Regions:
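Glycine/aspartate-rich loop-and-adjacent alpha/beta segment that forms the canonical ThDP
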Residues: 409-433
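Short beta-strand "acidic-cap" motif of Rossmann-like dinucleotide-binding folds
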Residues: 28-32, 133-134, 154, 230, ...
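Nucleotide phosphate-binding/pyrophosphate-handling subdomain across enzymes
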Residues: 4, 14-24, 132, 254-359
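Short, charged/polar "capping" segments at the starts of alpha-helices
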Residues: 35-41, 60-61, 74-77, 215-220, ...
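Short, basic phosphate-binding NTP loop
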Residues: 2-108, 290, 298-300, 390-397, ...
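C-terminal helical cap/extension that packs against the catalytic core
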Residues: 42-43, 348-403
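Short internal beta-strands
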Residues: 27-34, 209-213, 335-338, 357-366
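Phosphate-binding loop of NTP-binding sites
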Residues: 3-4, 22-23, 59-65, 72-213, ...
Length: 433
């Protein structure tokens, strides 16, 4: 009789894990708490022999499972986790399941901000010489790739996914930065840090650990890691004379970098280090960096119109991410669209950045009142409140700034389906003008 595996949720990663598990001969059960499911997907899985339930997590489905594969969105304090733990059923992430079933080396990218851009950039640089697709938290389940023939899997790993690994070992692991986010989910800042730290420490330590030299928490953490290479640092990889250097060799001048802002120079440094570690030459690395385009919704240049440049940074769902975008603009008249569903994060540092770099703030969404109060408390008063994204854009254009920047520092769910939807609404309206 074949081994029973339980898959939690009909997410993209859950569906991919179910298909892969069937191909490996497992008896696959999928349990989805939501009532509404995609009937086509359900039928496709059922035709493969997968048993599916939705609307509840029944005892019949849970009992007898050898292990469970979770979807990233299910919090560890959930009822289903409690029930599985009581039965001593091990819960792993889809990333772990993929790792256990392939010999293809993983390049793991994690961090609070910058990990998606870095993941996409690393894959793009390596594609000159290797087959190295993106996967993980970026929207491509690794189990959908491991039957194919690749040199590397460039995997964006969230704190949720990292926490649910035990044996996962990357060839190279990169930690872009660490700032408070997802604290509710993990139940505290230290838990959030430790979740990410797992994939850098024994028994899961990578061959090489790439860490941010400018992040004090990561600099301290580096003492616990092996084979550390720092970025944004004078010795390993950093900026000198307006160029990025690696081990004393000039790789690319800042003016040739397609991405703006110091945070993006850091992302490029991560890409350079990884490319050098897998044996690429400087001219190929430089050529690939120059041809790279930023992923959507991450300080994405939308258009120039009547002397105004529009940037969509809808992925900035916390103040730290918005600070990074705000600090990218110097000596320009910038109109910033802020707001959305408030995460109740500390706004002090962001207010300081706004004071330095922003001319006008346009507020939308549920966070408006708290953001206005904090901005005024920190000495910024050029604030305009609008009801919709379209109204905010129209008002911003009427001010004739150099830049209109959408970088909300908030979740999107008060007015939009997702940060992607918010970014699309911004772009569509700007492009319709």
């Amino acid at each position: 009789m074949s081994e029973k595996v339980l898959i939690l949720g009909l997410s993209k990663s859950g569906i991919a894990a179910a298909k892969f598990a069937v191909s490996k001969g497992y008896d696959v059960y999928v349990t989805e708490k939501k009532n509404e499911v995609n009937l086509e997907q359900v039928k496709e899985l059922q035709n493969l022999g997968v048993k599916i339930e939705h609307g509840s997590h029944s005892e019949e489905f849970i009992s007898g499972a050898s292990f469970a594969i979770t979807s990233p969105g299910i919090p560890p304090k959930s009822e289903i986790f409690r029930r599985l733990n009581e039965k001593n059923i091990k819960i792993i992430s889809e990333v772990e399941f993929a790792y256990l079933n392939t010999k293809t080396p993983f390049i793991a990218i994690t961090g609070t901000n910058g990990k998606t851009t870095t993941t996409a950039l690393v894959s793009h640089i390596l594609s000159k010489k290797f087959s190295a697709p993106v996967c993980g938290n970026i929207g491509v389940p690794p189990t959908s790739l491991i039957e194919e023939n690749h040199d590397f899997l460039v995997c964006e790993i969230s704190s949720y996914q990292a926490q649910m690994t035990e044996k996962f070992k990357a060839k190279i692991a990169c930690w872009t930065n660490f700032t408070p986010d997802h604290i509710d989910w993990h139940g505290g800042l230290e838990n959030y840090f430790n979740a990410k730290a797992k994939i850098f420490l024994p028994p899961q330590e990578p061959e090489f650990a790439i860490l941010n030299a400018q992040d004090t928490k990561l600099k301290e953490f580096s003492k616990q890691c092996q084979n550390v290479i720092f970025f944004d640092d004078g010795n390993d990889c950093g900026i000198k004379n307006n160029s990025i250097f690696y081990k004393g060799e000039e790789i690319i001048s800042l003016k040739d970098c397609p991405l703006v802002g110091h945070h993006n120079y850091q992302n490029i440094m991560c890409g350079i280090i990884i490319a050098k570690l897998v044996g690429m030459n400087n001219s190929d690395i430089r050529e690939q960096i120059m041809s790279f385009r930023a992923p959507e919704h991450r300080l994405e240049k939308v258009r120039e119109m009547d002397g105004i440049t529009f940037f969509n940074d809808s992925k900035a769902t916390n103040p730290e991410a918005s600070i990074v975008a705000i600090d990218s603009f110097n000596n320009q008249n910038v109109a910033l669209i802020l707001g959305g569903r408030d995460k109740n994060t500390d706004l002090t540092e962001m207010c300081h950045s706004i004071n330095k770099h922003i001319k006008t703030v346009l507020l939308i969404g549920e966070a408006t009142e708290r953001f206005e109060e904090n901005l005024k408390k920190n000495g910024f008063s050029n604030i305009i409140k609008e009801h919709t994204m379209e109204d905010a854009i129209d008002k911003a254009i009427s001010l004739k700034p150099d830049v209109v920047l959408l970088s909300p520092a908030c979740a999107s769910f008060d007015m939009f389906k997702s940060y992607e939807h918010r970014g699309e609404v911004f772009k569509d309206y700007v492009l319709s003008k």
